[in-house]
């Protein structure tokens, strides 16, 4: 067990040396499952079955999982729900599943590549007032970005994005090295043996939002755009022929003919759009990793810290080697 001895949430809420239990609710569930026989929940849908590794499941999360299992595009995928499951946008946080030839950009979400950069520090004591001042002065949070792009911009070329015309490249470049908002944080943890760990939790900032929303909209247009075009063409033709009394009946018939039982949040991309999304998602994941490393660089340099070991964990991404999606799990 670790304890947080200093931390900064975004917006900032810095406290020291206050003891805060890490992931208290998650630990409670894990302890509960260890103390008794593990109970898994199985949710059967029209096209798939999800296995939930938890004895407890809120109703909103259950409904979202059921909806995913009822979609034909997920037939054949392996769906596993982690113990930290809770309702999210489009699908539950805690979703892990295999991907085939279709992907819902909204399931990865707008914070593509969100994760944590962890650095074991050689130091055993930290001047927290100095650290607090450094973070507030040098690391933008909320909607703010850097005035001058961080040097790590040299390690990525965002002009390679296939949706580059949908992205504010200048803002993206100045976002590397910024914390963002929501549940993102910077903290120092102490292990039971006294070692200190710097942890930075952040993602792809507004770039991830731009990429995700572009492909989600493209997916919706691909699925429903043709139907909208046919409806408008029929209306124009009926007006030209003076058959105004038939317009409403024709609209109703065409909408019924092209009706799709797919929630808008689960609109998927396939084919060329699938390839383009995977390409841009991987580049955005690299951006998120560099963003965290840039913040670590600012802190390590400003504080004069020495790193013993560094590692990254990601919890909002698709492993493109194994084609496995992880949504906050």
Predicted regions and their residues:
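Targeting/processing segments of secretory and organellar proteins
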Residues: 1-5, 13
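A generic, well-ordered mixed alpha/beta core segment in the N-terminal half of proteins
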Residues: 105-160
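Domain-length cofactor-binding catalytic modules of enzymes
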Residues: 38-67, 74-81, 87-93, 102-105, ...
